[in-house]
Amino acid sequence: MKRFLIGALVAGSLFATGAIAESAPNTLGKIKAAKVINVAFASNALPFSFVGTNNEPAGYSIDLCKRVIARIGQAVGQPNLKVNWLAGSTPERLRMVATGKADLECGNTSQTFARLASVDFSGLIFVDAGGIMIRADSSFNSMADLDGKKIAVLKDTTTEARLNAIVQKHLVNTRVVQVGDANEAVAMLESGSVDAYAGDKIKLVGLAAQTKDPAKFALLTEEISFEPYAMALPRGDAALRLEVNRALTQVYLSDEIEAIVGRWLGVLGRPTALLSAMYLLYSIPE
């Protein structure tokens, strides 16, 4: 059977550059003057970024982000830098960074060339794959079985773009249903309003784990996309990007990364060979 039950389980380039703007932003100067850093984050992307205990942001990406924020605080001479957390969807978070409303973005955002037109990115923080979640009691064993069915997907995401390409080429009778919220998609899948939900695999596992009965859901083994996660940054700000990547390198080279992975992704077992290689490749020498 080409799927596995989720209930049995209960994470660009080294220097994403982009074109240099005529007047490069001085985000570090802005943060130093305000003594505040504005950080856009995903409020419902367990286990990467979500609203946790005491209504505070939590997750794998948030832990990395806090290390980055501490490094930025040191760089601007504000070790107790105040953090203003700004929740939003992926398009909203990218817009916040592009317009200057947010100085940094932390979530489960994939780096793409299309997005590099408006923002820069840090080194990679995670690598995932797009997958398909179904109900465990369904008869679907492969993507081909979903021809003529309804698949939910978050609108304006990299998964949506890849899913549409697959549908147009291989599943011409399938209907792609755009949704604005992950919980809405899970509810639609559980009720039978849709037959499947496409998203990043680790996030799908996290969403199922939040339901009353995770064993009701399963993942097809097929992968539909490659998702390289990174932190979105203001475009053209090399000084900020330097501090962000230095902070990430320090975490990757220390025991901290094992603790962070264990805390948020430990239920899935040890990091994959690909993820381990990513930590090594993005550990930039001084």
Predicted regions and their residues:
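Ligand-binding clefts/hinges and TM-proximal coupling segments of bilobed small-molecule sensing domains
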Residues: 22-23, 159-177, 215-217, 248-286
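A ligand-binding cleft/hinge motif common to bilobed small-molecule-binding domains
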Residues: 91-92, 106-117, 162-169, 187-225
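Acidic, polar ligand-binding/catalytic clefts
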Residues: 66, 77-145, 284
